[in-house]
Swiss-Prot record:
One of its GO terms (biological process) is sucrose catabolic process. Belongs to the glycosyl hydrolase 13 family. Residues 1-25 form the signal peptide. SMART domains: Aamy, Alpha-amyl_C2. This is Alpha-amylase isozyme 3E. Ca(2+) 2 binds at E133, T136, D138, D142. It catalyses: Endohydrolysis of (1->4)-alpha-D-glucosidic linkages in polysaccharides containing three or more (1->4)-alpha-linked D-glucose units. Binds 3 Ca(2+) ions per subunit. Binds starch not only at the active site, but also via accessory binding sites on the protein surface that are important for efficient binding to starch granules and thereby increase enzyme activity. Gene3D superfamilies: Glycosidases, Golgi alpha-mannosidase II.
């Protein structure tokens, strides 16, 4: 009896360790860009044909666009939240079929959740657009001006609470301190989970309402993955270049993820800003004063979603683009380093970088690199950056060819491209998604 008990305990422990490792070995894929809504035949149907290719990049999660009716075609000015058939990306049935296809490939799906603000269908007696329609025959999400933040004076009747975050001028800021708002948005999110099959959330403009309020929606909907958009602004010097110390910038991200609690993560805008400056001859930027990575990744890697570009920073908006000729240096960095990397649709399918990105993702997978992998920065100078990850993978960025003899003889090149190279240690590969102990 005792022997069987010990065996069972060992099995349970092994399963728990594997589950923990798999949870950490996450790769996010953004499955759309700013122009995806224009696709003839619908984006959901088009993306359905790409599911297998997306899964082959190593993606464990795919981020899909806002699903509801919206005044803007991209989905970021939502109105009738339950009305998914009015989306420019396709119908509710097509979305559900797409989610099922991803699930068949063991890829979980995140909905882009835009709840900071909302567009009204009708005017009130003042002639102000502040009467909302939920998109159902009943009264769910049918709100009036009472549900708008009192300091959003363009739309509010003054009865709501003050905004708990940054204002959004283009549409009414919703009062998330209102119990009815909390209850009905929670019900809508749970409907997306149970009826549509979504697994988690990407929270748009998450700095528009406080972290404790975001936590309410996370705690009450049980998502497997949550990532918030806290678009922090780097601190710049007088010469227009980023300051060496970006601790205040990444502290904003830390405050949010700690305020929301797990499983919440945040897009690591600090790392993006520093990385895209570093690859332009300033690779010394890729370590902080303590020898760690300089972004959120250096402080809380398990809650840092690293990325090169997205539909805002890149695509046709190009609000803060990564240098186009150095994009693969960006992927060599995020796909071999700690944190949770996010791959952008455009780079895989529109830039013809699928093979290079998939190769790096495979290196990450077969070496068991995960969000909390150990990072040892070996060199960070203007024209060269070299780091070892988990003692198994070495990544070099920059044009300098000679790394100065710091690459051990038992490491061999497994990927290389424009100003990047990746080595792998022989004999230490582990099954995909597992840590090496």
């Amino acid at each position: 009896m005792g022997k069987h008990h010990v065996t069972l305990c060992c099995v349970v422990f092994a399963v728990l360790c594997l589950a923990s490792s798999l949870a950490q070995a996450q790769v996010l894929f953004q499955g759309f860009n700013w122009e995806s809504w224009r696709k003839q035949g619908g984006w959901y149907n088009f993306l359905h044909e790409k599911v297998e290719e997306i899964a082959s990049t190593g993606a464990t999660h795919v981020w899909l666009p806002p699903p509801s009716h919206s005044v803007s075609p991209q989905g970021y000015m939502p109105g009738r939240l339950y009305d998914l058939d009015a989306s420019k990306y396709g119908t509710e049935a097509e979305l559900k079929s797409l989610i099922e296809a991803f699930h068949d490939k063991n890829v979980e799906c995140l909905a882009d959740i835009v709840i900071n603000h909302r567009c009204a269908d009708y005017k009130d007696s003042r002639g102000v657009y502040c009467v909302f329609e939920g998109g159902t025959p009943d009264g769910r999400l049918d709100w009036g001006p009472d549900m708008i933040c009192s300091d959003d004076t363009q739309y509010s009747n003054g009865r709501g609470h003050r905004d708990t975050g940054a204002g959004f001028g283009a549409a009414p800021d919703i009062d998330h301190l209102n119990p009815r708002v909390q209850r009905e948005l929670t019900d809508w999110l749970n409907w997306l989970r149970t009826d549509l099959g979504f697994d988690g959330w990407r929270l748009d403009f998450a700095k528009g309402y406080s972290a404790p309020l975001a936590r309410i929606y996370v705690d009450n909907t049980n998502p497997t993955f949550v990532v918030g958009e806290i678009w922090s602004s780097l601190i710049y010097n007088g010469d227009g270049k980023p300051s060496t110390n970006q601790d205040a910038d990444r502290q904003e991200l830390v405050n949010w993820v700690e305020g929301v609690g797990k499983p919440a993560t945040a897009f690591d805008f600090t790392t993006k800003g520093i990385l895209q400056a570093a690859v332009q001859g300033e690779l010394w930027r890729l370590h902080d004063g303590n020898g760690k990575a300089p972004g959120l990744m250096g402080w809380m890697p398990d809650q840092a979603v690293t990325f090169v570009d997205n539909h805002d920073t890149g695509s046709t908006q190009s609000l803060w683009p990564f240098p186009s000729d150095k994009v693969m240096q960006g992927y060599a960095y995020i796909l071999t380093h700690p944190g949770i990397p996010c791959i952008f649709y455009d780079h895989v399918f529109d830039w013809n970088l699928q093979h290079e990105i998939a190769t790096l993702a495979e290196i990450r997978s077969r070496n068991g690199i995960h969000a909390e992998s150990t990072l040892d920065i070996l060199k960070a100078e203007g024209d060269i950056y070299v780091a070892m990850i988990d003692g198994k993978v070495i990544t070099k960025l920059g044009p300098r060819y000679d790394a100065g003899g710091i690459i051990p003889s038992d490491f061999h090149v497994v990927a290389h491209g424009n100003d990047y190279c990746v080595w792998e240690k022989e004999g230490l590969r582990v099954p995909a998604g597992r840590k090496h102990y």
